[in-house]
Amino acid sequence: MKQLFATTSRGFEELLKVELTELGAQEAKVVQGGVHYQADDETLYRTLLWSRLASRILFPLIETKIYSDLDLYAAVSGFNWLAQFDERVTFFVDFNGTNQEIRHTQFGAMRVKDGIVDYFERQGKARPDVDKIQPDVRIHAYLNRENLVISLDLSGEALHLRGYREDAGQAPLRETLAAAIVMRSGWQAGSPLVDPMCGSGTLLIEAAQIEAKIAPQLYRLHWGFDFWKAHNQSAWEKVKNEAIELAEEKQREIQPHFYGFDLDHRVLKKAQKNAQNAGVSHLIKWQQADVAALKNPRLNEVGTVICNPPYGERLGTTPALIALYSVFGQRLKKEFCGWNVSVFSSESTLLDCLRMRASRQFKAKNGPLDCVQKNYQVSERKSDAITDEKELEFNRTSEVAPDFANRLQKNIKKISKWAKQQELDAYRLYDADLPEYNLAVDRYADYIVVQEYAAPKNIDENKARQRLLDAVTATLQVTGVETNKLILKVRQKQKGTNQYEKLANKGEYFYVNEYGTQLWVNLTDYLDTGLFLDHRLTRKMIGELAKGKDFLNLFAYTGSATVHAALGGAKSTTTVDMSNTYLNWAEQNLILNDIEGKQHKLIQADCLQWLEKCDRQFDLIFVDPPTFSNSKRMEESWDVQRDHVKLMSNLKRVLSNNGTIVFSNNKRGFKMNLVALEELGLSAVEISHKTLPLDFERNKQIHNCWMIQHI
């Protein structure tokens, strides 16, 4: 009996133990990352040929403790390698693990290689060559602290390489992982198996090979034991011939009941080719189909739906994935009553969009990703959520977040008509109208932006996440917007300058119309879009006041108020902001509206410092400072409640005799110090109610706005 070790992905050790035992392995013992077992020659070859879960099968040669690289070299060079293979073979060393002495795997591999070739030289033999591509022999070294195990890799190439996959989709599953998913899915051989997002077909191919009794390595041409001196050719031929006969016998019995669907016809062609290579093409039916129109191909039977849908690391944006999983769940409940469902994903929250309760779940790794496989039982009662294909889009909303969907629908009917009359492309459709759906929904031309407000600490995080997913799904259906045109953002309370920090680097800009102006927006790269929608009427008012006046825009952001002032006939405009990014944006807004000339100045500066040094006067000033800022680029912190009087003192100095300051901020509960302003010789009148547009009328505290003049 030989002592062997089968490696596998973490989480599959117990499953592998069961598989090896069924193949005849003795004394199987689970450890992290694999299973130790004993086998005679036939059982050894059977486990190599038939294991669907093992990554490699290793034959340990050296087990010792080492405390230096000299110990490593001595252990290797003192071993009788000629008993395993001769000098004419090529070899390669895989070295895993490090310790205080062997700090790099490449160094460890080099010392093992040196020990092997030096051993052959001492025996008067030629030095065997190293081949990194396709060696005759693979040596596997594993170091854990001072414990060293050096093994002969009898697999050769890793066992997940079945040989049937010539090409894969964008995010393929390893064959060993796919086999484990099938084994854990609850699918029973002989019953229908459907994969509605099959990609390159790995799940179905592995399942079909299981039912057809095709050994996963039946078509492998090269093995790690080909040049092993202990190789038992007769035992190997016996095991392989048994596998060939079993596959041929089983092929005649099986009827096709595997079904693969995918929206991408190109990846389906790859799946068909892979199935042909695997010897199961006659068992699987492939069809191009959208999951939103998924049909049950075996209505009178009960089977299993198995799926590895796209998730965060694979294809699509978050809103698209939310919609995909939601629609998938609805189709399952309509078409697959009484069926088993097994879904594998790295995003447990996306699985919540299925709106089904899992009966079992398993953790697994897909490369570096922590994933989960959840099994469900679809109710035998047909879901009435979708009764008519033609009304698919409308009726979906009645199942997912119906209260939110109804309110959004109502708001759209009211606000869209008003926006059209006002010639507006950008406006708010929903603003936390319902406490349980604490988010905002804005339309920017053909795009929808969903901004989630940070949930209060007393709200369960999972519940808040589920409500967000439901709201996104409902928004997609109610608005009819394409999934790639819905942008999802998480908005938190602003501190300092983090509202200006970059979130992405897509650089996708387009313009929207606002009262005859055109303004650039960017919906993805920053927390804000470049246009504060609640200040729309304020900007319009500035345009109406600006004719023939020298205009100053302080804390200008992207200069949208400057555009209104210039188009309103301002004699000159001065736009000041500390951010070069937003100042460039402001320049592009001016260019977009054909505003040019030396009279329109753009100045990058700390607004407060610039104001203290400014030596000219303005007839109309718009100042919209942040609530708070402690930017490193500012000499002192800024607090609008604390510092607004000092700001007004400096503004008074640059305000012409008949001039007007339009002052606004977003601090809730802001109190203007009217007494201090009067002492400065200024009067202030609050005009907040006049600057609040229809789409923000529910949120009367979103900003406060004041008209300030000399007494």
UniProtKB/Swiss-Prot annotation:
Q: Which parts of the chain are coiled coil?
A: none
EC number, UniProt record? 2.1.1.173, 2.1.1.264
Q: Which UniProt keywords apply?
A: Cytoplasm, Methyltransferase, RNA-binding, rRNA processing, S-adenosyl-L-methionine, Transferase
Catalytic reaction annotation: guanosine(2445) in 23S rRNA + S-adenosyl-L-methionine = N(2)-methylguanosine(2445) in 23S rRNA + S-adenosyl-L-homocysteine + H(+); guanosine(2069) in 23S rRNA + S-adenosyl-L-methionine = N(2)-methylguanosine(2069) in 23S rRNA + S-adenosyl-L-homocysteine + H(+)
Gene Ontology CC, one term: cytoplasm
| Entry-linked PROSITE patterns | THUMP, UPF0020
Among its keywords, does the record have Plastid?
A: no
Q: Where in the cell is it found?
A: Cytoplasm
Start and end residues of each THUMP domain: 43-154
A molecular function annotated in GO for this UniProt entry is: RNA binding
**Keyword Heme appears in the UniProt entry:** no
Pfam families (alphabetical): Methyltrans_SAM, RlmL_1st, THUMP, UPF0020
* Function field: Specifically methylates the guanine in position 2445 (m2G2445) and the guanine in position 2069 (m7G2069) of 23S rRNA.
Question: Of which family is this protein a member?
Answer: Belongs to the methyltransferase superfamily. RlmKL family.
Q: What is this protein called?
A: Ribosomal RNA large subunit methyltransferase K/L
Species of origin reads Haemophilus influenzae (strain PittGG)
GN (gene name)? rlmL
